[in-house]
Amino acid sequence: MKLVFCGTPAFAVPTLEALLQAGHDVALVVTQPDRPSGRGMQVLAPPVKQTALAAGLPVVQPEKIKNNLEFRAQLEAIAPDAIIVVAYGRIIPKWMLDLPRYGNLNLHASLLPKYRGAAPIQWAVAMGETVTGATTMRIDEGLDTGDMLLQDEMEIPPAMTAEELFPLLAEMGAPLMVETLAGLEQGTVTPQKQDEAQATLAPILTREDGRVDFARSAAEIYNRWRGFQPWPGAWTMLGGKKLTLHRMLLAEREDRAEPGMVRVHAGRLFFACGDGGWLEIAELQLEGKKRMPVTDFLRGNTLAPETRLGA
């Protein structure tokens, strides 16, 4: 098939590579403009652009697409059979939806209709799901509401973070998109409506999502920490300074304490949760300091017996 591929981050790269390997004609790659990134704020090309250029593919990086007449004319001249959209980061306008015969096909990193939105991987982990997957779907004018084409699923190991899950779902989704295109061409894939009664949302993450609410259960706090890696992570306040909890573990203790209260025992640091359970902090970072193991932190900081996190 003649394709236009729209994608930006590393998550989209395996799908682009799989389409090329399957022999599809990727006539154009559309990606977001180069942006400053990292501590030095160096202007970097998106991973999809780097992959496309290495493969000798033409690349465009429009700032806007909805009313971009030059971009529209370019796509109309290509007349693609399908437009593939994987983590592109832009809402696809109606004129693009109407252009190709097979439509605009999206790889979404959840088992739709669950976790529609910008952060499906993070929210699936944060909500304690034990199974997730990838869905190919035909994009419509709603938010991840289009007809589903194919799905594949995988287990989420109990200690896995969203950051670790990202590349696994990217690799799972790549052959799924290739299979979807083959099925559409052969007439063996039947679009399926989503069950609105089963739909849940996975909205874009904010800094506040990472703030630890100690009234939650130990499992909830732990799952949110796993889900919100690498950003916004899990953080709280200690002595008026931001304390980032880089690594934590489920823990068992016999004693009880008010939510947020800390206990230090044998060089280990624990805090109480809303259900009476405990979590252990293994690695942390106090505002203005470097990231460190808890053992190093406790060597240089003495916590009073009634220390409470969150203040």
Swiss-Prot record:
Protein origin, superkingdom: Bacteria
Binding-site positions, (6S)-5,6,7,8-tetrahydrofolate: S110, L111, L112, P113
Cross-referenced CDD domains: FMT_core_Met-tRNA-FMT_N, Met_tRNA_FMT_C
Keyword Thylakoid: no
GO cellular component terms, A-Z: cytosol
Keyword flag Membrane: no
Protein family membership: Belongs to the Fmt family.
Protein name: Methionyl-tRNA formyltransferase
Organism: Acidobacterium capsulatum (strain ATCC 51196 / DSM 11244 / BCRC 80197 / JCM 7670 / NBRC 15755 / NCIMB 13165 / 161)
Top-level taxonomy: Bacteria, Pseudomonadati, Acidobacteriota, Terriglobia, Terriglobales
